Amino acid sequence: MKMLASLLALGLMAAPAFAATESFNDVSVVDVACSKKAVADADSHTRECALGCQKSGFGIVTADKKFLKFDEAGNAKVLAALKATDKTDHIRVNVSGDVQGDTIKVTSIKLL
């Protein structure tokens, strides 16, 4: 019985390591502070606002209007992209990563 419990516990701990990578293409980037109001019209969210609210972090609005926050690495990647772009609004990306709850652990991101 102890062996079965140990194997079950080990399996549960290893499950996140086998999480499937998901890709989201042509989705809007929004800062966390503005995410609730921006979900309705994410394309109207501006680069200026995103940079002004950068301390709250960033995420994407999916096609089904769900907001997924980025992990720290994703925040750093999108912040660098936002600082480098001339776009003022309609900030969209292709992003891949492991979704865990309402957070995406970003493995790749490309500003469109």
Regions found by a protein language model. Name each.
Residues 1-8:
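Positively charged n-region of N-terminal signal peptides that target proteins for export
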Residues 13-21:
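Sec/Tat signal peptide C-region and signal peptidase I cleavage site
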Residues 20-24, 62-64, 98-100:
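A short, structured loop/turn motif at beta-sheet edges
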Residues 22-56, 97:
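Structural detector for short beta-strands of small beta-barrel domains
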Residues 27, 88-104:
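Flexible glycine-rich surface loops and low-complexity tracts that mediate binding to linear polymers
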Residues 48-73, 112:
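OB-fold (S1/OB) nucleic-acid-binding surfaces
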Residues 76-94:
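Short nucleic-acid-contacting surface segments enriched for D/E, G, S/T with interspersed K/R
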Residues 103-111:
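Short, low-complexity, Pro/Ser/Thr/Gly-rich segments in the mature regions of secreted, periplasmic
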